[in-house]
A protein has these predicted regions:
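N-terminal glycine-rich anion-binding loops that anchor highly charged ligand groups
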Residues: 2-14, 371-380
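Glycine-rich beta-alpha junction loops
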Residues: 3-8, 196-197, 258-260, 275, ...
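Conserved N-terminal alpha-helix of the aminotransferase class I/II PLP-enzyme fold
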Residues: 7-61, 83-91
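Glycine-centered tight turns that cap/initiate beta-strands
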Residues: 46, 118, 281-287
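PLP-dependent enzyme catalytic core of the Aspartate aminotransferase-like
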Residues: 48, 89-90, 98-99, 113, ...
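Conserved PLP-enzyme active-site core in the AAT-like
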Residues: 51-281
C-alpha cells in the first residue's frame, strides 16, 4: 500500500521511466499488489499478461481505446451491458470512434457486412448482461481473424471457471471483477488479459503498437515487449494519462474473493438452475430465460461453451408486465432490490427501469425480451428456499 518507491540511483530511475528496466515508478501505473492479483487472473484465463483497472467499464474502455482512435470503427454484439452500450454508442463516438452493432446470433455473412476498412476490433460478452444471450465465440472469432482484427470479449458473467474464452479464439478478455471475482460487494474493479495469440504486426491496422511512441523516446511496443506489447502499452501509456488504477487495498480485497471463486461460482450455478426450474412452472411467470435449461433457446451454445455451468443470473417475466414486476419487487422478503450481481446476497432488479434506463423506447422495443416484458433478474447465492414464492403469492 504505497504510492511511491525508493531507488538506489538516478540511473535506475531513468531506466524505469525509459521502459528499459522492469519495476515500479508510481502507483498510478503499477503496484506490486495489483500486479500480483492481475497475475492470478491472467493464470485463471490462461493468458500471457494482464492488468487491473478501477472498474469493469474502465477495462472495456481501455481494451478498445488501446488499439482504436478517432476515425476508427468497432463491430460489437448488440447484446451487451447497458453501461457498455452507452460507453460505445455515446461516449466513445464523441472521441471519434464509430460502432456497428450486430445480433449475437448473427451468421458469418451478417457479421462480415458490418465491417469497414477502418474496423479495428470485434467486441462481445460471453453471456450478455442481462439478457443471457451466449455469444457464438468461434463464429465471431473466425470473422474477426479473417479481417485481421482481434476479438475482445467481456467474460464477467461466465468467469474463467465456466468458460476459458481463449480456448475458443478470443484474443483479449475483460472482466468487471466487482462481480463474481470479488464476490462480496466490497470493492469496484476490472481486469484485462491478453491471450498473446494475436499478431499485431500482421497488418498496418495497429500503429499504436507497431510504430514508435514518442512519449517514450520512440519505443515500439511490439519490438520491445513481444507478446506483452498490448498490456504494456495499456499500462504505461493509458494508465499514465488516464488513471483508472485501483488502490492496492481494493486489489487485496479482490484477491480474497478470488480464493473462493471456484466454490462460489459452482453454488451460484446450482442455485440459479433450481430457481429457474421453480419459476418456469409457476402460474404467475410468463417466461424464464436460463441457458442451462434444456428447453432454453441458448441451451446448445451453453452445452458447447459452458458445460460446467452458466452463471448465477436468471431472467424472467411476471405476468402483467411492468406493473406486476414492480409489485413482485415490493413483495420480496429474502432477496433485496439492488443493481448488482454476483455477491454473497440474493438480489432482484427491473433492468428497464434501472441498469438499462438510458435506453429510449425505440431501443427498448428492439432489445431483448427482458427489457420489453417486465423482465427481472435474480442472483441466488444463499439457500433457494422462499426466494420468490412468497412474493409471487402476495395479493399486493
Amino acid at each position: 500500500q504505497s504510492t511511491t518507491y525508493k531507488y538506489d540511483s538516478s540511473v535506475e530511475m531513468g531506466n524505469l521511466f525509459d521502459l528499459k528496466a522492469s519495476g515500479y515508478f508510481y502507483s498510478r501505473l503499477q503496484n506490486p499488489t495489483n500486479d500480483t492479483v492481475a497475475g492470478k487472473i491472467t493464470m485463471l484465463e490462461g493468458g500471457v499478461a494482464g492488468m487491473l483497472t478501477s472498474s469493469g467499464q474502465a477495462a472495456n474502455f481501455y481494451a478498445v481505446f488501446n488499439i482504436a482512435q478517432a476515425g476508427d470503427h468497432i463491430v460489437s454484439s448488440s447484446a451487451i451491458y447497458g453501461g457498455t452500450y452507452n460507453l460505445f454508442n455515446v461516449t466513445m463516438r464523441k472521441l471519434g470512434i464509430d460502432f456497428t452493432f450486430v445480433s449475437p446470433d448473427a451468421d458469418e455473412e451478417e457479421i462480415q457486412a458490418a465491417f469497414k476498412p477502418n474496423t479495428k476490433a470485434v467486441f462481445g460478452e460471453t453471456i450478455s448482461n442481462p439478457s443471457l444471450d451466449i455469444l457464438d465465440i468461434e463464429r465471431f472469432a473466425k470473422v474477426a481473424h479473417k479481417n485481421g482484427v482481434p476479438l475482445i470479449v467481456d467474460n464477467t458473467f461466465a468467469t474463467p471457471i465456466n468458460c476459458r474464452v481463449f480456448d475458443w479464439g478470443v484474443d483479449i478478455v475483460t472482466h468487471s471483477t466487482t462481480k463474481y471475482m470479488e464476490g462480496h460487494a466490497s470493492t469496484i474493479g476490472g481486469a484485462i488479459v491478453d491471450s498473446g495469440n494475436f499478431d499485431w504486426t500482421q497488418n498496418d491496422k495497429f500503429p499504436g503498437l507497431t510504430t514508435p511512441d514518442e512519449s517514450y523516446h520512440g519505443i515500439t511496443y511490439t519490438e520491445a515487449f513481444g507478446k506483452g506489447a498490448y498490456i504494456t502499452k495499456a499500462t504505461v501509456q493509458l494508465m499514465r494519462d488516464l488513471g483508472s488504477m485501483p488502490s492496492p487495498h481494493d486489489a487485496f480485497l479482490l484477491n480474497v474473493g478470488l480464493e473462493s471463486l471456484h466454490l462460489r461460482v459452482a453454488r451460484h450455478c446450482e442455485n440459479a438452475k433450481k430457481v429457474a426450474n421453480y419459476l418456469k412452472s409457476h402460474e404467475k411467470i410468463a417466461w424464464v430465460s436460463y441457458p442451462a435449461l434444456e428447453n432454453d433457446p441458448q441451451h446448445a451454445l451453453a452445452e458447447k461453451y459452458l458445460p460446467n455451468g452458466v452463471c448465477g443470473v436468471i431472467s424472467f417475466g411476471v405476468k402483467g408486465g411492468r406493473e406486476a414486476a414492480e409489485k413482485f419487487l415490493g413483495n420480496l422478503k429474502v432477496a433485496m432490490i439492488a443493481t448488482h450481481v454476483a455477491d454473497a446476497r440474493t438480489c432482484c432488479l427491473h433492468p428497464a427501469s434501472s441498469t438499462h434506463r438510458q435506453l429510449n423506447d425505440e431501443e427498448l422495443k428492439a432489445a431483448a425480451q427482458i427489457l420489453r416484458d417486465g423482465g427481472l433478474v435474480a442472483f441466488p447465492t444463499e439457500t433457494v428456499y422462499g426466494l420468490g414464492g412468497n412474493a409471487l403469492d402476495e395479493k399486493a
